[in-house]
Amino acid sequence: MSESIDHNRRHFLGTAAMTIAAAQLGILGGAKAQSLQTARLPFEGDLPSLGGATAWLNSSPLAASHLRGKVVLINFWTYTCVNWRRTLPYTRAWADKYKDHGLVVIGVHTPEFPFEHNIANIRWAIKDMEINYPVVVDSYYAIWRAFNNEYWPTFYFSDSKGHIRHHQFGEGDYQQSERVIQELLAEAGFRGVSDDLVSVDPRGAEVAADLDNLRSSENYVGYEQTANFVSPTGTRRNKSHGYAYPAQLGLNHWALQGNWTIGKEAIALNQAAGRIAYRFHSRDLNLVMGPTVQGTSVRFRVGIDGQPPGSTHGFDVDAQGNGTVVEQRLYQLIRQSSPIADRQFEIEFLDSGLQAFDFTFG
């Protein structure tokens, strides 16, 4: 990666954490922002340039002159981030509802994993996820740094004069965000748009997390970031090694079986029939993974508590647990119904040539 990024930044931020993070961002404008604290939407600084883009997708490049007189919503995203995926139904709906009423939505794709630098992968994600608004590719973090941004996802709301007036870190607060859009449009003189709020029907990985039943947190499987890896021999860094399961797994512990190489950011399967087991407590279990060589595919089979998943299968798996890794992306493998309990997940790969990066839950 071109820049070291704190992977934990993608997690949803609570109210206190958002306040602390906002104070750390350069866009807050110091004394100027403080002098306008009584305003409903204070000035937080000027909208930074998007000139550091690697490429533009869904649009020709949009300079400041193109955005003058428009309300602009900037959304930092990376396509494997499940927290961002859960915000996407709202962003799509806002872009569609307000596009003819003065709003320009721009997605800034700043990659987390190495394969997310690949523009072909970003193009695939845009098409698969039905993103029709402009996307600026920020592969070298130039725009990320210009905004002093720290999180996926983040939303910045700019008025028609190019001033940032509001920001949202992480998921949630969708009604407030849409009211901000409406207020900025009204302030700019745009009329004739309904003040009703959008209604969305999220599917698959876009469904909001079940926070009441979430007892497992994101876990990267590369040695730099992973936690609770309990195969008996421990980690053999950057070496092909035969791993085995322990006698049992505790909650949020995971293990490997078969011949794997554990790298800094990912694990790679060297021989067919390799397995990963993970004991978890959540409605959803997702895994970011992909073939080691693009253009190939890897078959897999998922189980839960030693049985096919049946009705608990995720969007990318059938009831018998069968699926195929084709793209480098997030795969939703388990979606349970209530009651949620501690469960043991296992995935067996029937072919070699697989890389796995990150477990997420929801």
Each PLM stretch: what is its role?
Residues 1-11, 18-21:
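N-terminal secretory signal peptides
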Residues 14, 40, 45-51, 178-362:
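Non-globular targeting/processing and membrane-anchoring segments
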Residues 34-65:
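N-terminal "domain-start" segment that seeds a small globular fold
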Residues 63-82, 105:
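Short active-site neighborhood of thiol/selenol oxidoreductases, capturing the structured segment around
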Residues 69-72, 101-104, 131-133, 160:
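Loop/turn elements at helix/coil->beta-strand transitions in domains of secreted/extracellular proteins
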Residues 85-128, 139-143, 298-300:
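Structural microenvironment flanking redox-active thiols in thiol-disulfide oxidoreductases
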Residues 120-158, 287:
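Short, internal strand/loop/helix patches
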Residues 164-185:
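Non-catalytic, surface beta->alpha helical segment in thiol-disulfide oxidoreductase systems
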